[in-house]
Amino acid sequence: MTKSELIERIAERQDQLSAKDIELAVKLILEYMSQCLANGDRIEIRGFGSFSLHYRAPRTGRNPKTGESVELEGKFVPHFKPGKEMRDRVNESLEELP
């Protein structure tokens, strides 16, 4: 699902807010979450999950076009850990599939 599809689906399910208001709210939430992670903060949304940064150590990678080895620097990457309610809900939904 893309951000645009998320906004559309939310707009279809309620009639109190305009699609533009929903779009603004979604963009503001995502921007604030990105800023929090950029500041090194952890985000926890109970029942949904948590976002944090994990450090990826320096390593030797490979250029897929040439096959030559390339040294990659260490970096922080965003990490999402689903909450128990989210895991349970996903697993229940998948059990119903053929």
Swiss-Prot record:
Q: Which CDD domains match?
A: IHF_B (cd13836)
| Name the record gives this protein | Integration host factor subunit beta
User: What organism is this sequence from?
Assistant: Teredinibacter turnerae (strain ATCC 39867 / T7901)
GO terms of biological process kind: DNA recombination; regulation of DNA-templated transcription; regulation of translation
Kindly indicate whether the keyword Transcription regulation belongs to this entry.
yes
Q: Give the CC-aspect GO terms.
A: chromosome; cytosol
- Any idea which UniProt keywords this protein has? DNA recombination, DNA-binding, Transcription, Transcription regulation, Translation regulation
Annotated Pfam families: Bac_DNA_binding
Q: Which PROSITE patterns match?
A: HISTONE_LIKE
GO MF, one example: DNA binding
Task: Point out the gene that encodes the protein.
Answer: ihfB
- Family classification: Belongs to the bacterial histone-like protein family.
Quaternary structure note: Heterodimer of an alpha and a beta chain.
Gene3D superfamilies given for it?
IHF-like DNA-binding proteins (4.10.520.10)
Q: So where does this one cross the membrane?
A: none
Function (record text): This protein is one of the two subunits of integration host factor, a specific DNA-binding protein that functions in genetic recombination as well as in transcriptional and translational control.
